[in-house]
Amino acid sequence: ARNIEKLKDLKKEIKAHLIKCDVTNIKSVTNLFKKTDKIVGAPNLVIYNPSKSLGGNIIDLDPKKAYEAINITCYGGFLVAQQAAKRMLKKKRGSIFFTGATASVKGFPKSSVFAMGKFGLRGLAQSLARELHPQNIHIGHFIIDGGIGRENYGSYKTIHPDSIAKIYLEFHYQDKSAWSWETELRTSVEKF
């Protein structure tokens, strides 16, 4: 995260290490992995979650903000995957997962920038799956089709974060004879 202050409670809860990182900066991403190497070694699983949404009419969008949003949503995924793959290829195993959205497969009005970033991230994941699966690196892309939250859990209006985490782990442990590269997650009441 760029701002690790908001994660301090989570750090205590799950006994995690916090490392500040700007995913759009090559040096920052390289430093993240070098620090991780020293703390816990080469990762077995890397999940890329960052994204930035920018909505609005195409004629009103600020090009600089659009550039930043696409860099965070997509280019950062490339930088993180590159560093993760370098380490995993040496170990001859690992998983790299990307968190997508409905916008990964369907553009909506006034969401062109978000769709560009998520479409690009999905394309990256699909290409990497074809490149790295034969080398025992599992690539996954997860289309999160709905809001995420703990509230309204019984009504299934949002996807519970613990349920998402469970699916990610199940995907990580898929048998090599039945690997998939993409899955969609939505509540039972979400229209699609």
Describe the predicted segments one by one.
Residues 134-192:
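C-terminal helical subdomain
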Residues 81-82, 126:
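A short, exposed helix-loop element centered on a Lys and neighboring polar residues
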Residues 14, 35-48, 54:
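A glycine-rich helix->loop->beta "capping" turn
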Residues 95-120, 126, 130-133, 143, ...:
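Catalytic loop of short-chain dehydrogenase/reductase
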Residues 4-5, 20-32, 63:
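The beta1-alpha1 cofactor-binding region of Rossmann-like NAD(H)/NADP(H)-dependent oxidoreductases
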